[in-house]
Every structure is written in structure tokens, then in C-alpha cells.
Amino acid sequence: MSEAYRQPVLGVIGGSGVYDIDGLEGARWQTVESPFGDVSDQILRGTLDGLEMAFLPRHGRGHVLAPSDVNYRANIDALKRAGVTEILSVSAVGSLAEDLPPGTFVIADQFIDRTFAREKSFFGKGLVAHVSMAHPVSAWLGDRVEEVLADLAIPHRRGGTYLCMEGPQFSTLAESNLYRQWGCHVIGMTNMPEAKLAREAEIAYCTVAMVTDFDCWHPDHDHVSVEAVVRVLLQNADKARSLVKAMPAKLKDRPYPLPDGSHRSLDNAIITHPDRRNPGMARKLSAVAGRVLG
């Protein structure tokens, strides 16, 4: 990774209800092209308390993209091209646990990927890589997020398994009960393959899963109005903005590379012999894997 990446640049991917960042100095929407296709939207650039920030609305402004229609590869590639070194991924989820009521923020540290209609890797024919996903998120970044949530007195849980489904329909009762048997804590539609791609791009990634309601396993599920869910969604969005505003102070002394390995996840991952690597693929991966491809 070049010297340009030594200074932290915090990327924020906003999910349902979070479409911008308040208080950015020098705020401007910037188009970033990606060889992997269309990015969800322009990237909002600026500084917050001296920290460079880059915000991307996952579903586009106005929420025009369904989870299956988001080009996750283009989004992560564009954030890497924008200089992002850490990603705070904010998304709305349903709860699969009684002790995670609406309004709780879960710093998920594991995922089960049940998506099936999405491109899940930057690598492929002509340039093959296998990145470890045993620990898919940055423990260091998760620690900083946990500190902020505690400071703000936002109900939260550190650790948990995020079940990512394809959508756009919600789960059946049988599926919801199955995921609970698997030990999952929250269910959503967007953090896979997002977390996998951030790992491949050597960007430290932290999920903040904001519980809006209980999934359909819960006996009260059918009695909760849409208005109540929307109210929690908006309250969560306000809390998420408070979280983002407090993050710069936690990142100013960020070590490089991070001790959890997030900035070095491609070490020994590429297995295609240098003489056999596809030049076109290598050019396409110039941002994602430039550190190891040279």
C-alpha cells in the first residue's frame, strides 16, 4: 500500500435512512468511475474535525437500488480509489434475538452469506486470489465504534452473527426460525458481499447493524405497524449520524497497518503465477490490489 494510504480516510456506506453526513467541511459530491461498473451514486467528500471523509449511499440518493441491484464491487472499488482506508457500514436489520430489541446497534463480527445473485469477488479467471474470511471485520475499528456507542449511551451489542439474505422479500417464518437455530443475531440484505469485497480491497471494515424490528419469528411481529418501524428507522438514522460525527477523534491516531491485519489481507492471497496473470485483469485491479500487484 502506498504512502497515500497511511493517513486515515473514513468511508461511510449509508443504508436505509442514512443518505448523507451532517457537518462536513468542504462538502462536495464527486463522481468516481470504476472499471467494475456503475457505482450506486456519487461520493460525498469533505472533512469532519480534520479527518477526510467519503460517504456513499448504498442504495443511491432517494433509495433507487434494491439490495440485489447494488453493484457492491463498483462501490468498494470506488471507495478505494477515493483513498478510503476504513469503512463504517451502516444498515438496517431485523432482530433474531429477544435481547436485541428495536433501537439496538449491533457491531456484527461474523456473517452467514445466503445471497446468490451477486458478484462476490474482484478476482477470477486470469488472476485468482483466496482471501481469509475467518475474521471478516476489523477488530480495531470495532473497538473504536464500541467506545463511541458507549459514550453516546446508544444501546448496543459488541459481536454477533449477521445473516445476509438475497431479498428483496423478507424471510418466511420457517427461514426465520432456522436462522435462529443457527445462532444468528440479526438479518439483513446488504453486508454480503460488501464485507468480502472490502477484505479483498484491504480496507478495514466494521458493520453497524441497526435493529428496526424483530424478524417474523417474534410473536409480536404481525402486530407492529409500518409507522412504528419507520419511526425506529428514523431514530436509528439520527443515532448513526451522531456515531459518525464522533468517529474522527477515534481515528486520528490510527496505527498503520492495523494490528488486526485488515490492511494486509492480500498478503500471500494471490496464487496465479506472475507470468500467467491476465494484464487486463491486473489493470482492472490497480486500485484494489495495487499494493501486491506492483
Curated annotation (Swiss-Prot):
GO biological process: L-methionine salvage from methylthioadenosine; purine ribonucleoside salvage
Site (Important for substrate specificity): S171, V226
The entry's keywords: Glycosyltransferase, Purine salvage, Transferase
Enzyme Commission number(s) of this protein: 2.4.2.28
Residues involved in phosphate binding: S16, R58, H59, S91, A92, T190
Gene null: resulting phenotype: Mutant cannot release methanethiol upon 5'-methylthioadenosine (MTA) feeding. Deletion mutant accumulates both MTA and 5'-deoxyadenosine extracellularly.
Keyword set includes Nucleotidyltransferase: no
Function: Catalyzes the reversible phosphorylation of S-methyl-5'-thioadenosine (MTA) to adenine and 5-methylthioribose-1-phosphate. Involved in the breakdown of MTA, a major by-product of polyamine biosynthesis. Responsible for the first step in the methionine salvage pathway after MTA has been generated from S-adenosylmethionine. Has broad substrate specificity with 6-aminopurine nucleosides as preferred substrates. Also catalyzes the phosphorylation of 5'-deoxyadenosine (5'dAdo) to 5-deoxyribose 1-phosphate. Part of a bifunctional DHAP-shunt salvage pathway for SAM by-products.
Database matches in PANTHER family: S-METHYL-5'-THIOADENOSINE PHOSPHORYLASE
Quaternary data: Homohexamer. Dimer of a homotrimer.
Protein family: Belongs to the PNP/MTAP phosphorylase family. MTAP subfamily.
This protein's name: S-methyl-5'-thioadenosine phosphorylase
Provenance organism: Rhodospirillum rubrum (strain ATCC 11170 / ATH 1.1.1 / DSM 467 / LMG 4362 / NCIMB 8255 / S1)
Biological classification of the source: Bacteria, Pseudomonadati, Pseudomonadota, Alphaproteobacteria, Rhodospirillales
